[in-house]
Regions:
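Glycine-rich phosphate-binding "P-loop"
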Residues: 135-165
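Transmembrane beta-barrel domains of Gram-negative outer membranes and organellar outer membranes
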Residues: 1-109, 127-129, 191-193
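Feature captures outer-membrane beta-barrel proteins of Gram-negative bacteria and organelles
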Residues: 42-54, 79-93, 116-131, 142, ...
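Extracellular loop and loop/strand-boundary signature of outer-membrane beta-barrel proteins
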Residues: 107, 152-154, 209
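Transmembrane beta-barrel strands of outer-membrane/channel proteins
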Residues: 18-22, 61-67, 101-105, 140-146, ...
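A short, structural micro-pattern
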Residues: 95, 114-116, 136
Length: 229
């Protein structure tokens, strides 16, 4: 929740996700504050996979639409966005790990940040209690990246120095998981829900819990769907 993992899509995979964020202090369903400033917004991401991370290298191409809600008739749906690429490899026989590199925004338009987000990341799958009935399947992730993973110091100084990010997620019920992460400048935590037998997933949480970043604490609601053709 709040950071990328080293896992990704493969050939014939297609995915789409929609996210909603709202200022924590203003409330979950407050779109504009008393000064008519936008304090909530939606975003969208969609793309497709190629290759095979088990046999060779897998990859995905994704497009991100930054804003779905206009501000004074400007910066509405599709006005700002990015397109990027991710390459990833699975190593099931080597501690069940995955590795990936990504450049999330080589293509930018509108008010998208001009700083490049490039990262390398490793994720490891494991079970907290492998011999128990309730195994608590887990995913541990650690990476280094620029752009959205910069420290607050780098953001204030307008530099693009690399920074460390990481997170941990655990399945606490058959269809419920909990995850927490540090994205380089903010602490995030949330729950993942998979209520159906088809790949429609939801996550609900709070980003920047400690209000360490410039955005402050925000509610986050995300839904994603993927399929193979």
């Amino acid at each position: 929740f709040g950071i990328p993992s080293a896992m990704g899509s493969s050939w014939k995979d297609v995915f789409v996700s929609v996210a909603y964020t709202a200022d924590y202090d203003e409330g979950l369903f407050t779109w504009y504050d008393k000064n008519n400033k936008k304090v909530a917004d939606g975003s969208m991401n969609f793309g497709f996979g190629f290759g095979d991370p088990n046999e060779s290298i897998g990859g995905e191409i994704s497009v991100g639409i930054i804003s779905l809600l206009s501000q004074k008739g400007e910066s509405g749906f599709g006005a700002d966005g990015t397109a990027g690429i991710k390459l990833h490899k699975s190593f099931p026989s080597f501690l069940n790990t995955h590795a990936a590199i990504s450049w999330t925004n080589p293509i930018k338009w509108g008010e998208a940040t001009k700083k490049d987000t490039v990262y390398g990341v490793i994720s490891k799958e494991f079970e907290l209690r492998p011999d128990a009935d309730k195994k608590f399947a887990s995913l541990l992730t650690l990476g280094v990246g620029t752009g959205s993973h910069r420290s607050n110091t780098a953001i204030k100084e307008n530099t693009n120095d690399p920074n460390i990010f990481g997170g941990y997620g655990v399945q606490i019920l058959p269809r419920v998981s909990f995850a927490s992460s540090w994205n380089g400048n903010a602490l995030n935590a949330g729950f993942g829900l998979s209520p159906f037998d088809f790949p429609l997933n939801f996550s609900l949480g709070i980003s920047d819990i400690t209000e360490n970043s410039t955005n402050g604490a925000q509610f986050n609601i995300n839904t994603g769907y993927s399929f193979r053709f």
